[in-house]
Amino acid sequence: MDRAQVQIPAEQLARQRDFETKIRDMHAQRPLRAMVDTFGCQQNVADSQHIMGMLEAMGCTFTDDPAQADVVVLNTCAIRDHAEKRVYGNLGALTHTKKANPQQVICLCGCMAQRPEVAEKVRQSYRHVDLVFGPQALWKFPELLYQVYTQRRRVFSVADEHGSIAEGMPVVREGRTRAWVSIMYGCNNFCSYCIVHYVRGRERSRDPERIIDEVRGLVAEGFKEITLLGQNVNSYGKDLGIGYDFADLLAALDQIEGDSLIRFMSSQPKDASHKLFDVMAASRHVARQLHLPVQSGCDRVLRAMNRPYDVEKYLELIAYARRVMPELVLTSDVIIGFPGETEAEAMETVALVEKVRFDALFTFIFSPRPGTPAARLPDPVPREEKQKWFDRLCAVQNGISEELHRQYVGQTLRCLVDGVSDDARWQLTARTAGGRLVHCTGDKNAVGEYRNVKITDSNTWALFGEVE
């Protein structure tokens, strides 16, 4: 893809800043209040932070109450049917706030909004929604919102575009603990069950200098953890044409002085390499944490999923990563019940989980996405049967996670204290360098700081301890 076509010109981005000023001036007598509700992955979280940055530049303050908001933004996820149903439920509930405040502007954006059938459904059945735009139009949100205000009409911007890169968009990040940094956008993998490449476009890598400058700035601001984001970070740089890959980027970021930890997600096994693992092992600031989705432990199912690796390749990668990083925390994704999968094939996945012994596993029953090849495959196995396979898989993984967590009891771990615990028995939540959740007692002044935590107990999902 031509880089000149991918990069949004500076003058077009400056034009968006002008629209932000115009909207702020339009509402100077009573500044707008906005609510941004985010569904889905960390990339959506990062996108929402840019949306909030643009809204803040428009003079907005923020609220969590849609009834108090002049602008409501739902940033949506299309990865599973359940996520879409939640969004439609929320859209339905907003009819009441719109009725109470007819001037309220309701915006639908994100991956779900990029799907033409969704945009048409919203156009016909959710007439209180004023603005619909996909991920490719995120950078021109101020212009689209300005059109809603000045032209008094509904605006839809879901054109079928390859995607772009917009640098320098405003951003609002909460606190100084964690920051998300997108290093690339889109996906070229075309897994047969996945809709991401249809709604996020083809792969586009940001220039490494831009990423390095952004991370250096975040470290200087005091952020303790920085997570690099992409649909497949391991393919970073392929489109740049300069012989620069993700391992090179990690090595460069590791040279930034400071007390910050670098994480990354998500990864594709086909692009993972020994070079990447060697860079991680030699680094000072890169977490010994790897999320490497395997999706299935059956080679036939992997081929049907259009995942271009086999179980042997996956196991070789894991063996090498663990050899150079014995302390590695390994997590993965698994889909159970892919169309045509048999019980014996599902049990191959269970066997792989038993062999690899992941620290944690994100497990899902297959959810057909309209427009994907997998959605057209015959799927004769009843949901109830798939649920049994799923429960078996979860039982195995839960036992492994509980056992692995138990080995930390009695140890003292350096953790980043990141907030107040939802569990009434504990004051704080923290994360180990490997990303393990820790509920702990301690002074709330520790939030945002690295502290040593003495681990006193554990269960399947978390560690428990005391801040020293």
Report the location of each language-model feature.
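Short flexible coil/turn linkers enriched for glycine and charged/polar residues
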Residues: 174-177, 187-189, 286, 296, ...
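Conserved SAM/AdoMet-binding glycine-rich loop
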Residues: 106-108, 115-117, 220-348, 354
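Short glycine-enriched, charge-decorated loop/helix-capping segments at active-site entrances
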Residues: 78-79, 200-201, 240-243, 303-309, ...
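Generic beta-strand/beta-sheet core signal
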Residues: 37, 196, 229-231, 265-267, ...
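Terminal RNA-binding accessory module
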Residues: 1-3, 19, 376-468
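Proteins enriched for Cys/Gly/acidic motifs involved in redox and nucleic-acid/cofactor modification
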Residues: 1-236, 275, 290, 312-323, ...
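Conserved, mostly hydrophobic/aromatic
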Residues: 191, 211, 228, 264, ...
